[in-house]
From Swiss-Prot:
Accelerates the degradation of transcripts by removing pyrophosphate from the 5'-end of triphosphorylated RNA, leading to a more labile monophosphorylated state that can stimulate subsequent ribonuclease cleavage. A motif (Nudix box) lies at residues 49-70. GO terms for molecular function: bis(5'-adenosyl)-pentaphosphatase activity; guanosine-3',5'-bis(diphosphate) 3'-diphosphatase activity. The gene is rppH. Belongs to the Nudix hydrolase family. RppH subfamily. This is RNA pyrophosphohydrolase. One of its GO terms (biological process) is nucleoside phosphate metabolic process.
């Protein structure tokens, strides 16, 4: 068994993508069907992903949008000044995130979606990260995710509420 204390945190970026109505995009993960996501089955989350070596977080968040939802139609409106960190539950240590990390430390960005819904293409990446997506109201975000990430999402709802006003 892997001891979590011996593992590092994975550096990661998260994208809270707001549409013109002030709603945010979430996607249903393809790799975790029925994993305890509270609504509609599966796990729903904002686009996010690892930061490549020699990549700055701003570049990484735009790359993740291209990879996960197939669009570059977004502009960065703001970012959290600090990083948010979560630990994986004990049952996932040594299994999730390639078994190499105890959790993630995340730099989160608020972005404005500048395209049309038809610009979102989940099949640009193979295998796709998400099999469905939807726009939701910001306050409902924490309850749409797995329990061990809810505190991060509650913090983001509070900190990014100013971006949820219609454009």
């Amino acid at each position: 068994m892997t001891d979590a204390a011996d593992l590092p945190y994975r550096r990661n970026v998260g994208a809270m993508l707001f549409n013109a109505q002030g709603r945010i995009l979430i996607g249903r993960r393809t790799d975790q069907p029925g994993a305890g996501g509270p609504l509609d089955g599966g796990v729903w989350q904002c686009p996010q992903g690892g930061i490549d070596a020699d990549e700055d977080p701003e570049e990484a968040v735009l790359r993740e949008l291209r990879e996960e939802i197939g669009t570059d139609r977004a502009v960065i409106m703001g970012a959290r000044p600090d990083w948010l960190t979560y630990d994986l539950p004990a049952a996932l240590i040594g299994r999730a995130l390639g078994g190499r990390y105890r959790g993630q430390t995340q730099k989160w960005f608020a972005l404005r979606f500048t395209g049309q819904d038809s610009d979102i293409r989940l099949d640009d990446q193979q295998p796709p990260e998400f099999d469905a997506w939807q726009w939701i109201d910001l306050p409902s975000l924490p309850e749409r995710n797995v329990g061990f990430k809810r505190d991060i999402y509650r913090t983001l709802v509070r900190d990014f509420a100013r971006f949820s006003q219609p454009a």
